[in-house]
Structures are given as structure tokens and as C-alpha cells.
């Protein structure tokens, strides 16, 4: 029973991440510009995590100074920069396109791991990379019709995949020394402080005085940032990491469905095939982590 509860936590986390685009667009309609949306996601999340951990898990505040560069990298590149490029992508492309481009990240992790740790690049990994690249071509409109996003938006999407992939690299080093909650807290410590550089209070204050602004900000922080990280982390206590990664790929599905339901976005057969290809590539990579998955 405990195992199924852990699976449910992972699914909840992934579905919550799928709401990022919804609240991002709500903030945009309230007049919150891109710079301030980066601040709204990261700084309040840092403050909220600080309060939660101060009450329930104070040990996360204790790390060795020599390990701070790990958290600086994950916070400033993997979270803060990711927020900026991903939000830009979502404004230039459909939510489905933005989500699927983001999920090219596992393929990039394979390449980075091979370069950094000499991890073997097997036939299965090559097949997964090709599937992901085909999926990218399909969902972006390079294959099968007109582009479903601007070239600028597609570049932002690829950049978001790179930033997302770097979190796995930094986490490899961070989790070798600390638990998951400590990794999350210090990542958002630097992401939150770094996001102050994006704050334009004179422009943000009027937007936050509206119902749309408050609702969008609260949703982005609680539903699309803090809760998914806490749910996903809780789920990892009872689910093997590779399986959790596969389950978490319901995020692009959730984002696509939310785009259809809330924004009346159209899912062509090519976009659907692209989603299948990208997720198929991720599934191949995760399967290789099992004892019977070598190829």
C-alpha cells in the first residue's frame, strides 16, 4: 500500500508542474511582465520553503560552505534561468510544445553523463536520443506541417531542456552529500535571491492588487512550484528514481490537456505523435537503469 501512495505522490507532483503554463498566462493577463514572473515564481517559493522547513525540518539549513557552488549552479542555472527561458517559450509556443521541448532534457543528460562520468552510450540510449529528436521535430512543426511555435520560442524551449538537464548533473553531486530536502531548499535559496534581480516592484505592485494577479501568483508558487517539489520528493521515498522519472512524464500530457481545456489549443496528429516519441525516448532511457535493460 505504501508503494502505491508513493506513486500517487509522484503523479501529483508531475500534474502540478503541468499547471505552470496556466498560472504563467494568468499572470501575463494581469499585466505581470516576464521579468516579474520569474521573481514571482522563485522568491516567494524560497520564502515559503524556508517557513515550512523551519517548522518541520531545520536540519536542511546546515550545509558545508565548500558545497555551496553545487547549490548555486542548481539554483541559478537549473531553476532561475530555466524559469526565464521556459516562461518565454510558453508565451511564444503552445503549452504542449513548451512542455515536450522541455522533456528533451533526459536525452541531454545522457550526453552530459557520457562526457562527465564516461557513462557508456549504448544502442538503447542512441535509439532514445533519435526518438526524442524525432519527437522534437514533430511537435515543433518541422515535420508534418506549419510550425506550432515561433523559431524564437523553439530556441527558448531547447534552452529550457538544457537548464532542466543540468539539475540532474548538480543533483548527482549534491545528493551524494545531502538529502533531497536539503538539495531542494538550497537550490531555491539561490534561485530566490537571484530572482531579486528581475524584480520591478513599481510594475508588479499594481498587478498584484488584482484578483488575477493574486490568483496567478498564489497558484504559481503553491500549485506549480512548492507542492510539486514536495510531492515528488515525498514520492521518491518509496519509488525508485528511474520509475519516478517515467511517471513524472505525465507533466507534458497534463500541460497539453490543460492547454486544450482552458485555452482551446488544438492538438494535431503530429503534435500527439511528437509527444509519444519524446516520452518513448525517455522510457527507453529509464528502462536501461534496470538490471535487465542493458543493450
PLM region spans:
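C-terminal transmembrane-helix exit sites in multi-pass transporters
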Residues: 48, 53, 86, 105-130, ...
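Loop-to-transmembrane-helix transition segments
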Residues: 5-15, 40, 60-85, 151-160, ...
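Glycine-/small-residue-enriched transmembrane alpha-helix faces in small-molecule transporters
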Residues: 1-40, 146-173, 293-295
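Specific transmembrane alpha-helical segments of multi-pass solute transporters/efflux pumps
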Residues: 21, 50-96, 138, 221-239
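Membrane-interface helix termini and inter-helical loops of multi-pass transporters
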Residues: 22-34, 60-61, 91, 140-152, ...
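Helix-helix packing/entry segments at the starts of transmembrane helices
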Residues: 8, 40, 79, 83, ...
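Small-residue-rich packing faces within the transmembrane alpha-helices of Major Facilitator Superfamily
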Residues: 18, 43-47, 133, 189-193, ...
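Hydrophobic transmembrane alpha-helices of multi-pass small-molecule transport proteins
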Residues: 49, 72, 121-142, 195, ...
Amino acid at each position: 500500500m505504501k508503494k502505491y501512495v508513493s506513486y500517487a505522490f509522484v503523479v501529483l507532483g508531475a500534474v502540478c508542474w503541468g499547471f505552470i503554463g496556466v498560472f504563467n498566462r494568468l499572470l501575463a493577463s494581469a499585466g505581470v511582465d516576464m521579468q516579474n514572473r520569474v521573481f514571482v515564481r522563485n522568491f516567494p517559493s524560497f520564502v515559503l520553503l524556508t517557513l515550512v522547513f523551519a517548522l518541520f525540518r531545520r536540519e536542511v539549513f546546515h550545509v558545508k560552505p565548500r558545497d555551496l557552488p553545487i547549490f548555486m549552479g542548481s539554483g541559478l542555472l537549473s531553476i532561475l534561468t530555466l524559469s526565464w527561458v521556459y516562461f518565454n517559450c510558453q508565451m511564444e509556443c503552445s503549452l504542449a510544445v513548451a512542455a515536450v521541448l522541455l522533456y528533451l532534457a533526459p536525452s541531454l543528460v545522457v550526453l552530459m553523463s557520457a562526457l562527465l562520468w564516461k557513462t557508456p552510450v549504448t544502442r538503447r540510449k542512441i535509439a532514445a536520443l533519435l526518438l526524442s529528436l524525432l519527437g522534437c521535430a514533430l511537435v515543433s512543426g518541422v515535420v508534418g506541417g506549419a510550425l506550432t511555435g515561433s523559431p524564437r520560442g523553439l530556441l527558448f524551449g531547447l534552452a529550457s531542456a538544457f537548464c532542466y538537464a543540468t539539475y540532474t548533473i548538480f543533483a548527482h553531486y549534491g545528493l551524494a552529500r545531502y538529502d533531497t530536502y536539503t538539495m531542494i531548499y538550497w537550490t531555491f535559496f539561490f534561485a530566490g535571491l537571484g530572482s531579486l534581480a528581475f524584480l520591478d516592484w513599481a510594475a508588479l505592485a499594481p498587478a498584484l492588487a488584482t484578483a488575477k494577479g493574486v490568483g496567478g501568483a498564489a497558484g504559481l508558487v503553491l500549485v506549480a512550484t512548492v507542492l510539486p517539489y514536495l510531492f515528488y520528493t515525498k514520492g521518491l521515498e518509496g519509488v525508485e528514481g528511474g520509475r519516478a522519472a517515467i511517471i513524472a512524464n505525465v507533466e507534458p500530457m497534463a500541460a497539453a490537456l490543460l492547454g486544450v481545456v482552458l485555452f482551446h489549443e488544438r492538438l494535431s496528429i503530429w503534435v500527439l505523435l511528437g509527444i509519444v516519441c519524446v516520452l518513448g525516448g525517455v522510457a527507453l532511457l529509464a528502462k536501461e537503469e534496470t538490471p535487465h535493460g542493458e543493450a
